[in-house]
Amino acid sequence: MSGAFNNDGRGISPLIATSWERCNKLMKRETWNVPHQAQGVTFASIYRRKKAMLTLGQAALEDAWEYMAPRECALFILDETACILSRNGDPQTLQQLSALGFNDGTYCAEGIIGTCALSLAAISGQAVKTMADQHFKQVLWNWAFCATPLFDSKGRLTGTIALACPVEQTTAADLPLTLAIAREVGNLLLTDSLLAETNRHLNQLNALLESMDDGVISWDEQGNLQFINAQAARVLRLDATASQGRAITELLTLPAVLQQAIKQAHPLKHVEATFESQHQFIDAVITLKPIIETQGTSFILLLHPVEQMRQLMTSQLGKVSHTFAHMPQDDPQTRRLIHFGRQAARSSFPVLLCGEEGVGKALLSQAIHNESERAAGPYIAVNCELYGDAALAEEFIGGDRTDNENGRLSRLELAHGGTLFLEKIEYLAVELQSALLQVIKQGVITRLDARRLIPIDVKVIATTTADLAMLVEQNRFSRQLYYALHAFEITIPPLRMRRGSIPALVNNKLRSLEKRFSTRLKIDDDALARLVSCAWPGNDFELYSVIENLALSSDNGRIRVSDLPEHLFTEQATDDVSATRLSTSLSFAEVEKEAIINAAQVTGGRIQEMSALLGIGRTTLWRKMKQHGIDAGQFKRRV
């Protein structure tokens, strides 16, 4: 080929001319070697990889050939390497091309067959037509080839659509025909790709919705259920498949707050509500999201199960760490408390802890909770002084909402599955005492402004510093509630009667302060002895306060007698004077009788506790009581 002209003088495109220049360096025009052909496993692998393109492309070629027959031509589908994957067309034409080596699996690269549209379309990325002596190889001068490249959704070359015919059969419409087929196949590939991507996203979304802890429901503008995940179906006791397409109001009785929000297309966030499904009430915390569109408003509803919301809240608010292991074991009075505390932990009955201010009733309550089978559940502490007014009833026992305010779980409901610690039970409002009695006796609670019963499973531990029996007689405390709480009563002796536990309490407090202040703390023996001998009218709380102040003010972390506050010596002197007067005015028998009477008053006349408190056997105690004419029954609390 001389210059850029055919033998007849027609000009050729730069694309073809450049191809000729490359081919001149690689091959001879006169020779023709049958092109390399992929066969067997290799061809099958290529075919599988292009399955999507072939499925669409073959259908398009069949449609095109049906329109073109009986024209002498052949239609090809090639991959991005110019390997023939599929052929269709006139049998005689296919046979002639096959004789040249153009079969399924044949590689039509430029380096093999020379300048030809089959390879140039892939190289240039555009539609190309070559005919007659535009081909580099003379064996192809009797043929015309048209080819248009195919691209995927990301713009990458994925194949070629080609047409081949004898040169005398070619027409001006051949190249546009391959272009039209290629565009059709490309559009179908794009549609399939987008559909596959959409399906993939839908599968991911469905997997996400099914793996959520929350239930998810959606319904259209007509109120017909469109989607419900397994969690929502389980919570609402619905058949997910059978419920599809049905009206949401046919499946459920919606709470008033939700009905109002739907009517106003108003969103809700973490609102407590109650559904009725299959004649059962179902509590849930809901979030509603309206989707406002031109054709109407559809909705997505999230169901946050109350049980999980309780667990979430109590995991942050309802954990305590004090156990019986933290209590000193050296003192017999403390060992007695641990013994009765463990009995209380094994029991399901309410527990009443009695004793002076500051004796550690709250810590004993925590130890009972952590020893019980409810240790993994919440521990909710309530100071009843705050609930002396019935106006706070809603916070204590809850109330059903009919507006758009966020619902809030009551203190009783928060304790579900765990322990409810009621500090200073004597201050609880009379109206709330009835609600508490209902929880203890029946295991249910009735909210304010509601008729339904809510199951509540709690262990009640109450404390008091008052004489509840006297309050009952004065009609200031519920008689029935007193009976319920009095079933398991533990009296905690004041610290002055548990002096043996003071060294352990002091050391435990010092170790705790060491961790807080990151320093070493120690106390001299004489200073500790002085602390043991003090009266401690404020009990454990006063002792801890003194130790903390001493730790902050001590020199180099050492607590000496000289560091002790003066009021401790004053209290000790007062106690010494009282003891001296007692010893001079009373005989030993009178002192013994007074000690037994004091023990009976503290323990309510319970022999076993009196025996432990006095440090003598029950037989000895019975003998001495008989000797002094003391009747334990007269000290029992009567209502």
Swiss-Prot record:
Residues 52-189 form the GAF domain. It comes from the Bacteria. The keyword Repressor applies. Keywords: Activator, ATP-binding, DNA-binding, Glycerol metabolism, Nucleotide-binding, Repressor, Transcription, Transcription regulation. Residues 327-552 form the Sigma-54 factor interaction domain. Induction: Represses its own expression. DhaL and DhaK act antagonistically as coactivator and corepressor of the transcription activator by mutually exclusive binding to the sensing domain of DhaR. In the presence of dihydroxyacetone, DhaK that binds dihydroxyacetone has less affinity for DhaR and is displaced by DhaL-ADP, which stimulates DhaR activity. In the absence of dihydroxyacetone, DhaL-ADP is converted by the PTS to DhaL-ATP, which does not bind to DhaR. One of its GO terms (biological process) is regulation of DNA-templated transcription. Residues 203-265 form the PAS domain. GO terms for molecular function: ATP binding; ATP hydrolysis activity; cis-regulatory region sequence-specific DNA binding; DNA-binding transcription activator activity. Positively regulates the dhaKLM operon from a sigma-70 promoter. Represses its own expression. This is PTS-dependent dihydroxyacetone kinase operon regulatory protein. It comes from Escherichia coli (strain K12). The gene is dhaR.
